[in-house]
Structures are given as structure tokens and as C-alpha cells.
Curated annotation (Swiss-Prot):
Alphabetized NCBIfam families for the sequence: PRK00521.2-5 (NF001802), rbfA (TIGR00082)
Protein's GO biological process: maturation of SSU-rRNA
Domain of life assignment: Bacteria
Gene3D superfamilies, alphabetized: 3.30.300.20
Record's function text: One of several proteins that assist in the late maturation steps of the functional core of the 30S ribosomal subunit. Associates with free 30S ribosomal subunits (but not with 30S subunits that are part of 70S ribosomes or polysomes). Required for efficient processing of 16S rRNA. May interact with the 5'-terminal helix region of 16S rRNA.
GO cellular component: cytosol
Protein's UniProt keywords contain Cytoplasm: yes
Principal place of residence: cytoplasm
Gene that encodes it: rbfA
Similarity-based family: Belongs to the RbfA family.
Official protein name in the record: Ribosome-binding factor A
Taxonomic source organism: Agrobacterium fabrum (strain C58 / ATCC 33970) (Agrobacterium tumefaciens (strain C58))
Length: 138
């Protein structure tokens, strides 16, 4: 009988993803990556998602104070092999060091869109004061 596959990440995937995120953050904070684009930019790593076999780590990053993120993301992907090698001492329990992939994190942009939508006059009108007396009488 085949095991049912779940789309939710396992506890192990979440734990390893958080360890990789912390290690990458330290590598970037210490300035170990020698690239003008990366050195002059504050980069926030919001999440690292691991593949089920733990061989691929996709890091979602947000370069702060930069309008166009594509150059920074490209620079991070160019230095992915170097950073993978620097993960070794911090992730000694791993049998294989995961391949690193960097992607632009759009969750903050989505948050801003939802916030703007909730603050729009049309939605505010619908969310206006409710009749609490009607609720209490029923």
C-alpha cells in the first residue's frame, strides 16, 4: 500500500530549513560573500523551504532599500556554491549539503496589497459599525 503524500512540509523539513536560514543569515552578516552588490545591501531571508529529500533549499530573500531585486538575486545565485560550502561547519549533522536557490520574496508586497484593499473606502463601509443589538436579540 502506497503512503499518502502530503503537500505540507514535515517537521524535519521545517527544522532543517530554519537551520539553513540561520546559517545563511550569519554568512551574509559576516560579509563572507565578496560581491559589490551583496556587500552594499541589507538582505532579509524570510524563509528557506527544503525539498522532501533535503537536497534543495530555496531561500526567499528581500533586498532592503533596492527597487530592482533581480540583480541581487542573480548575484546570490552566482555565489550559491560558495555559500553551500560555508554551510558545512554549521550543518554538520547533514549527510548532504543542500543545493541553494535564491528567489525573490513577494509576501511583503502581497501584504501591502491586502492592507491597501482593507483600507479602501468600499471595504471600510462594509466593515462599518454593526448592529450589536440585533445580534443580542437573536
Amino acid at each position: 500500500m502506497a503512503k499518502a503524500t502530503s503537500s505540507a512540509p514535515s517537521q524535519r523539513m521545517l527544522r532543517v530549513g530554519e537551520q539553513v536560514r540561520a546559517a545563511l543569515t550569519q554568512i551574509l552578516q559576516r560579509g563572507e560573500v565578496r560581491d559589490d552588490l551583496i556587500e552594499g545591501t541589507v538582505i532579509s531571508i524570510s524563509e528557506v523551504r527544503m525539498s522532501p529529500d533535503l537536497k534543495i533549499a530555496t531561500a526567499y530573500v528581500t533586498p532592503l532599500g533596492v527597487a530592482d531585486h533581480t540583480d541581487i538575486i542573480s548575484a546570490l545565485n552566482r555565489h550559491a556554491k560558495f555559500m553551500r560550502g560555508r554551510l558545512g561547519p554549521q550543518l554538520r549533522q547533514m549527510k548532504y549539503m543542500p543545493e541553494l536557490r535564491f528567489r525573490d520574496d513577494t509576501s511583503f508586497d502581497n501584504y501591502q496589497k491586502i492592507d491597501a484593499l482593507l483600507r479602501s473606502p468600499e471595504v471600510q463601509r462594509d466593515l462599518g459599525p454593526s448592529n450589536e443589538k440585533d445580534d443580542e436579540q437573536n
